[in-house]
Amino acid sequence: MVQPAPTTGTDVRTAVAARGLVKVYGRGDAAVRALDEVDVDFAAGRFTAIMGPSGSGKSTLMHCLAGLDSADAGEVHIGRTELTALSDRELTRVRRDRIGFVFQSFNLLPALTAEQNVLLGLELAGRAPDRAWFDAVVDRLGLRDRLRHKPSELSGGQQQRVACARALVGRPDVVFADEPTGNLDSRSGAEVLDFLRTSVRDLGQTVIMVTHDPVAASHADRVVLLADGRVAGELVRPTADTVLAALKHLGDI
């Protein structure tokens, strides 16, 4: 059963929150209200999926939450930091130091080894890696024997695992995953989803994922449902069947 989404205030257990979020593309008669007064919280240490029909605003919401796009109105908070009040320089620092990203495309540099790709963000930020944490992430992902390999020597699933390790190695407050299994076969996709699940359960990570796949969403603790730029409800402890039923109710299928 689809439950109404809560609209409680930001607290220490909330990793990410949006309040009154509005995003409009275009002007005049051609204007599209991609986000329409969105209020939503994402709990720390949980795996949340964002789903909805095509054009529902799910990717726009994630981009605004992650500071990749600016909202026209409303607030976004990462912990107690209001992203919408930051300068461009401050926002860049937050994205670099407190947010991890996993995209559909792996975005690995072909000339670097897997280990160099994992550590690249820290190197660019001038931060020394925590080798114990690096080892824990690499071992959880099963990359120990692949660290000296370049992307061309890795399968798609292995490349996405490298991308996951890169997102986690800096101990971010939250990892945003945008269709992380979109370029993978079903087996490799399942491996990546299992790791995201494990990173929450065993490493205490917070993961927010946009996906169109009910099976992928079933790995999450919670699914936030969007329709026409608004939060339409949520599912707790989702299964592929309950997600599919919710999407049918929203008119996606």
What do the PLM-derived regions correspond to, one by one?
Residues 74-82:
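Conserved ABC transporter NBD signature motif
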Residues 112-120:
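Short coil-to-helix segment of the ABC ATPase nucleotide-binding domain corresponding to the Q-loop/switch region
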Residues 164, 192:
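Hydrophobic anchor residue at the start of the ABC signature
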Residues 175-178:
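Catalytic Walker B motif of ABC-type/P-loop ATPase nucleotide-binding domains
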Residues 27-32, 83-100, 124, 241-245:
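ABC ATPase NBD coupling module
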Residues 150-160:
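Conserved ABC ATPase signature
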Residues 171:
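Conserved catalytic motifs of ABC-family nucleotide-binding domains
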